[in-house]
Swiss-Prot record:
<dbReference type="GO" id="GO:0005506">
    <property type="term" value="F:iron ion binding"/>
</dbReference>
<dbReference type="InterPro" id="IPR024177">
    <property type="entry name" value="Biotin_synthase"/>
</dbReference>
<feature type="binding site">
    <location>
        <position position="59"/>
    </location>
    <ligand>
        <name>[4Fe-4S] cluster</name>
    </ligand>
</feature>
<dbReference type="GO" id="GO:0051537">
    <property type="term" value="F:2 iron, 2 sulfur cluster binding"/>
</dbReference>
<feature type="binding site">
    <location>
        <position position="55"/>
    </location>
    <ligand>
        <name>[4Fe-4S] cluster</name>
    </ligand>
</feature>
<comment type="subunit">
    <text>Homodimer.</text>
</comment>
<keyword id="KW-0004">4Fe-4S</keyword>
<dbReference type="InterPro" id="IPR006638">
    <property type="entry name" value="Elp3/MiaA/NifB-like_rSAM"/>
</dbReference>
<dbReference type="GO" id="GO:0004076">
    <property type="term" value="F:biotin synthase activity"/>
</dbReference>
<comment type="similarity">
    <text>Belongs to the radical SAM superfamily. Biotin synthase family.</text>
</comment>
<keyword id="KW-0001">2Fe-2S</keyword>
<dbReference type="InterPro" id="IPR007197">
    <property type="entry name" value="rSAM"/>
</dbReference>
<feature type="binding site">
    <location>
        <position position="262"/>
    </location>
    <ligand>
        <name>[2Fe-2S] cluster</name>
    </ligand>
</feature>
<dbReference type="Pfam" id="PF06968">
    <property type="entry name" value="BATS"/>
</dbReference>
<comment type="function">
    <text>Catalyzes the conversion of dethiobiotin (DTB) to biotin by the insertion of a sulfur atom into dethiobiotin via a radical-based mechanism.</text>
</comment>
<keyword id="KW-0408">Iron</keyword>
<feature type="binding site">
    <location>
        <position position="62"/>
    </location>
    <ligand>
        <name>[4Fe-4S] cluster</name>
    </ligand>
</feature>
Length: 344
């Protein structure tokens, strides 16, 4: 099957895909998936919060926002040796990438050397690295690239025309600017959003349209299901229909055929059957481990059991002799993390 990568999708086309009969949509998405990936392979990453809580932003979904009473207290940036110990555990459990998230609006310049040290140490272990630290300027993006960072996560969260219902402390253009800085220095991008925040299907179409018409498709696209945390404004929101979530995965796969599509936050509450439908619809990446920053995630044993039942296997790593890396660094074609639970 020949699949053309397009950047000129219009919303009517994407809306028409959403409206297809469910079996037809899954057939199309699975066909696109098979054209670019081994459908039996799923990329596995581990995510660690290296700086938890105390964020000054007002994202309505986030338990790390300091203005909400969620029981999450502000903590200082972790020491590098503690991060390395967690990375070592992740590698032993089978992860091929280690993702580091910090609850910042944007890092201060004094924080960058500390994060750079974490990146260098984790890469020296043979893991790929990703980070999500909030908004970056051009100089900060360059410093992270020079430290050896592989991917940077910065989500759009939702459609441009629903954004003001969720966030007021950061503009949509701010997110696009950070993505531009990241692309300009040659970092790979991880960018997706969250569904189940009270948005309509048209808003979900709008999010995918914004992602699929970026100058370059994100290398990985995390699709997060809202994790409702008491104390956040979105707690108590009507849950999204499970089939609508699968449709979101399927249309993302069709619109961005060469991107990794990741099941991110909210997977703990998903049945094995729902996850299987998502894999059939084109999802090919998950986070491994019992926690995503401050919210739960399926434990490793459950994921291993699900992989065995479905005949899936973790994506294998390859060697990439990139110029900024140390000789012998091990790489994998995989995805990245996020600064809050919604990769999220």
């Amino acid at each position: 099957m020949s699949v053309v990568v397009r950047h000129d999708w219009d919303r009517k086309e994407l809306h028409a895909l959403f409206a297809l009969p469910f079996p037809e949509l899954l057939h199309r998405a699975a066909s696109v998936h098979r054209a670019h990936f081994d459908p039996a392979e799923v990329q596995v990453s581990t995510l660690l919060s290296v700086k938890t809580g105390g964020c000054p932003e007002d994202c309505a979904y986030c338990p790390q926002a300091q203005r909400y009473d969620t029981g999450v207290s502000a903590q200082k940036l972790m020491d590098t040796e503690d991060v390395v110990a967690k990375a070592r555990q992740a590698k032993a459990a089978g992860a091929s990438r280690f993702c580091m998230g910090a609850a910042w609006r944007s890092p201060k310049d004094r924080d960058i050397p500390k994060v750079a040290a974490m990146i260098r140490e984790v890469k020296a272990m043979g893991l790929e690295t990703c980070a999500t630290l909030g908004m970056l300027d051009a100089g900060q993006a360059r410093a992270l690239k020079d430290a050896g960072l592989d991917y940077y996560n910065h989500n759009l969260d939702t459609a441009p025309d629903y954004y003001d219902s969720i966030i007021h402390t950061r503009q949509y253009q701010d997110r696009l600017n950070t993505l531009e800085h990241v692309r300009d220095v040659g970092l790979k991008t991880c960018c997706g959003g969250i569904v189940g925040m009270g948005e309509t299907r048209e808003h979900r179409v709008g999010l995918l349209h914004a992602l699929a018409t970026l100058p370059a498709h994100p290398d990985s696209v995390p699709i997060n299901q809202l994790v409702q945390v008491p104390g956040t404004p979105l707690h108590g929101t009507e849950p999204l229909d499970a089939f609508e979530f699968v449709r979101m995965i399927a249309v993302a796969r069709i619109a961005m055929p060469k991107s990794m599509v990741r099941l991110s936050a909210g997977r703990e509450a998903m049945s094995d059957e729902l996850q299987a439908l998502c894999f059939l619809a084109g999802a090919n990446s998950i986070f491994y481990g019992e926690k995503l920053l401050t919210t739960g995630n399926p434990d490793t044993e459950r994921d291993q059991g699900l992989f065995q039942r479905l005949g899936l296997r973790p994506m294998q790593i390859t060697v990439d002799a990139a110029e900024h890396d140390h000789p012998g660094t091990v790489h994998a074609d995989i995805t990245c993390g996020a600064a809050c639970e919604h990769a999220a």
